[in-house]
Every structure is written in structure tokens, then in C-alpha cells.
């Protein structure tokens, strides 16, 4: 069986990133050819093996028993358009404050691998576009980095920080708007079809399957990237291009997924309030 070559995969993804950086206005019509057995093997290597099982009850160990055969079958179904996105299994986990729960959609293990592969390719494109204010679910960035930036600015300059949480964002994300935003950079038919299948996939909860017309399930590997694509257009670029130029003095946006913290220097914020 073939083994993943992380260095070779990384080099290929870097080529995509370089082209995306050099041509920020182009939309990629051909990206799916980068998803081959080698990249799927690397996607499998990067996928957690100890997560909860999806609707098919297949474990990572069971899938790995015939790994190359399973991945070749997956690749054929992806490229031929016959890949079926199975429903996600919905569970509810407590939020950090313990007062509420958060719905999490658990894909099948194979779906996790394919989502990881597609996310790797798309990430190479979108990491060249995303703004520095975005910290959530991005390589080399974390919630700690976002908090460190807020703390640094507050200590150095003094600031008024407004915390904003977009209510039920992952449940209400508009599919039509997302497709329009994806059109700006990614028009590859194979990749766009499988993303549509994930968006339309059912949700299994308490024995029944529903088909939500909006949102992208938290828990899916691809969901955070799609959320960042959406919020890049409606929040980050809006703040940079529309809000900041209208303000006097310094204002910054720090965003971690659907949690935002616009910041203004204390003196200037007070002047606005007056």
C-alpha cells in the first residue's frame, strides 16, 4: 500500500497557494485533479482516529483495514460525481458555560477524510485571501493568539472592546450567499458539487432524518473553512472597507469564527459616544 508523502503534498499545495497569491482576482476552474490517492492518504493521516462514529457506525480502524482500496473507491466516486454524502449524526454537547448545549454533526469517517482533502486544497487558496483579523480554524492561529492581540492593544493603547457573537451562525448560514462567495475563487465542478452535497446532507437525530435548508453542521471538517469564507465577505471585508474608513482614529476587528471583538481606542470611543 502507498504511504503519504507529506513533503510532496505540501509542495503541491504551496504551488496552489503561490498562484492564488499572485492572482487574487482569478477563480480556479481546475482544482480537483490535486485530489488523488497521495493527497487522500495524507488527508487520512491528518484525520483524527478516535472520534465518534457516524451514521454507518464504521470506525477508523475498520476503514483502515482496506485503506488503499477504500480510498481508491472514494476517489472514483468523487471524480465521477457518484459520491453520496451521508447524513451526519447530531449530538448535543454542553457549551463552555454549562447552561446550554451546542449541536454537533458527526460525519462518517470516510466523509471526514474527503472533507479534510477538500479543505486542504481550498485552504491553499483562501489562506492567501483571509485577513489578519481572522483567527478561528486557521493554520498557525488560535484563540490564544486572538486574546493575546486584544490584551496587547488594550495594555498599550487603552481600548473599548465590544464582543459580538453571531447567534446560531452555523445553523443559519445562507447557502445561496455562500455559493456566490465561493464563485469568486472556486468554480471547479467536482469540488463545488461535493460541497453542495455536504450542504444538502441530512441530519440524523433521535432516529429521524431532516434536511435543513440553511447552515453547515458544526463538527464537519469542511464547515469551519466554509464559515470563514462566508464571514470573510460579510464581516471582515465589510469592516475593513466600509466601517474603518468612516471612523476617526484607530479601530480593529478581531474575529474567531463567529465571535467578533471590534476594538477602538478608549479616548476615541468616548468621543463617539458623546
Named regions from a protein language model:
Residues 103-108:
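Conserved phosphate-binding loops in nucleotide/dinucleotide-binding enzymes
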Residues 36-39, 51, 67-71, 122, ...:
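Short alpha-helix boundary/capping elements
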Residues 61, 97-99:
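Intrinsically disordered, low-complexity linear regions
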Residues 115:
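"…together with the soluble PPM/PP2C metallo-phosphatase catalytic core" -> "…together
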Residues 118:
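Nucleotide/phosphate-binding loop and acidic/charged catalytic motifs
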Residues 111:
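Short loop/hinge segments at the start of secondary-structure elements
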Residues 77-92, 100, 121, 129-274:
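Conserved polymerase palm-domain catalytic core
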Residues 1-57, 61-68, 72:
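Non-catalytic, polymerase-adjacent accessory regions of viral genome-replication enzymes
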